[in-house]
């Protein structure tokens, strides 16, 4: 079973913690990771982009000048795509980008993402601030030399969230909001011991 250090928020190791092999020690499935990340990013898209084709732009029904004899290039409509204020060629229309992923694949992707982050994981014995204080959050991150950090707490923690929300490259979320994209996108995964236990309850 994978074993990692257990730290306090001052950066001092206070012990070790055994991680469940079914969650943090699986074979990384790159295909599942790719599928879930693509679906997650696709599902974030609004799909509301829209433009008009030449048939939808107002006007342009009459031929601007006769076909021959003017010395100018032949034109059929002032709303053709080559004209200013003309329609758009293959104009985008609103569409639904949603993708559905099987539950089993989502689980495989999540355990693969967690396994791939074990080497960059910092497990905290506890994480709480008496009051929202960005200075305290910066001090904690500096103690671990953390860059582009994802902080996962067991529950919604307002003090931790408010302390870290203004720090560039730091994301804070409760354990029930974790997702594959954010796990893969961080350089350092900072997670509380209680949050680890909750993850193992769900995915083991």
UniProtKB/Swiss-Prot annotation:
GO terms for molecular function: rRNA binding; structural constituent of ribosome. GO terms for cellular component: ribonucleoprotein complex; ribosome. The keyword Disulfide bond does not apply. Residues 44-76 are annotated as: Disordered. Gene3D superfamilies: 3.40.1370.10. It comes from the Bacteria. Keywords: Ribonucleoprotein, Ribosomal protein, RNA-binding, rRNA-binding. One of its GO terms (biological process) is translation. InterPro entries: Ribosomal_uL4, Ribosomal_uL4-like, Ribosomal_uL4_dom_sf. One of the primary rRNA binding proteins, this protein initially binds near the 5'-end of the 23S rRNA. It is important during the early stages of 50S assembly. It makes multiple contacts with different domains of the 23S rRNA in the assembled 50S subunit and ribosome. Forms part of the polypeptide exit tunnel. PANTHER family: 50S RIBOSOMAL PROTEIN L4, LARGE RIBOSOMAL SUBUNIT PROTEIN UL4M. HAMAP family: Ribosomal_uL4_B. Part of the 50S ribosomal subunit. Belongs to the universal ribosomal protein uL4 family. This is Large ribosomal subunit protein uL4. It comes from Clostridium perfringens (strain SM101 / Type A). The lineage of its organism: Bacteria, Bacillati, Bacillota, Clostridia, Eubacteriales. The gene is rplD.
């Amino acid at each position: 079973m994978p074993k990692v250090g257990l730290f306090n928020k001052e950066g001092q190791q206070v012990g070790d913690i055994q991680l469940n092999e079914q969650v943090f020690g699986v074979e990384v499935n790159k295909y599942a990771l790719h599928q879930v990340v693509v679906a997650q990013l696709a599902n974030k898209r609004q799909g509301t982009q829209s433009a008009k084709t030449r048939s939808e732009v107002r006007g342009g029904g009459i031929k601007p000048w006769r076909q021959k004899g003017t010395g100018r290039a032949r034109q059929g409509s002032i709303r053709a795509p080559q004209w200013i204020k003309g329609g758009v060629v293959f104009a985008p229309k609103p569409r639904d980008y949603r993708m559905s992923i099987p539950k089993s694949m989502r689980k495989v992707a999540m355990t693969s993402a967690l396994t791939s982050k074990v080497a960059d994981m910092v497990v905290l014995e506890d994480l709480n601030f008496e009051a929202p204080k960005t200075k305290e959050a910066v001090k904690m991150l500096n103690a671990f030399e953390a860059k582009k950090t994802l902080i996962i707490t067991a529950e919604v923690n307002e003090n931790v969230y408010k302390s870290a929300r203004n720090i560039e490259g730091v994301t804070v979320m409760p354990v029930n909001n974790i997702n594959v994209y954010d796990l893969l996108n961080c350089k350092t995964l900072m997670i509380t011991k209680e949050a680890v236990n909750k993850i193992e309850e769900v995915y083991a």
